[in-house]
Amino acid sequence: EEEQRDLVTREHRFDIALLGRRLVAAMRWLDAEPGTRDLPIVLFGASTGAAAALRAAAERPEHVLTVVSRGGRPDLAGDALPAVRAPVLFVVGGQDHEVLRLNEEAARQLRVPHRLQVIPGATHLFEEPGTLERVADTVRDWCEQRLRAASPQDEQ
C-alpha cells in the first residue's frame, strides 16, 4: 500500500527524515545480531537515498565506516551534513550538472575526509555504456581503502 501510494504521490521518496529513521532502525537491528554487530557498515544511497544515508550516519556516527552517494541529493540532508563523522564519497555524472553543483555545495559543508568523483559523460542514472562499471570500480576502491584504514595493523 505504501509503495503504491508513493508511486502516485512521491511523498515517501522525498521524506528524508522517514528514510533516515528506517536506516537507523536497520543499523540498530544489525547491531543487535551476533553475526553482524561487529561488521563495518557502509551506507550507500542514490538520489534521495543519499540524503537519508547522510542523516543516518550523522545520527549513529560510531557505527558507520563510510557513506557513498551515487548521483545523490546530499543537499536534502540539511543540517545533518556538518554532523557526519564518516568519510564520504560523492559519485556524480559529468553531465548531471545540477546534481554536481548540489554535491559540490554539500561537500563544502562536511568536516570529514571526502571525495567528489565525477564520471565523465554520465547522466543522472549512469545509463551510458561503461559508466555504471566506473561507478562500481570507484566505490569498490573507496571502500577497500576505508576497510584497510579501519583494520588493526596486525590484520593487514
List the model feature ranges, each with a label.
Residues 1-39, 125-130, 134-135:
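Serine-hydrolase catalytic machinery in alpha/beta-hydrolase-like enzymes
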Residues 40-45, 70:
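Short beta-strand immediately N-terminal to the catalytic nucleophile in serine-hydrolase-like folds
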Residues 44-53:
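Gly/Ala-rich beta-loop-alpha elbow adjacent to hydrolase catalytic centers
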Residues 62-74:
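A conserved short beta-strand
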Residues 84, 90-92:
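Short beta-strand/loop motif that positions the catalytic acidic residue
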Residues 97-102:
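Conserved alpha/beta-hydrolase "acid-adjacent" motif
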Residues 109-125:
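Catalytic histidine neighborhood in serine/cysteine hydrolases
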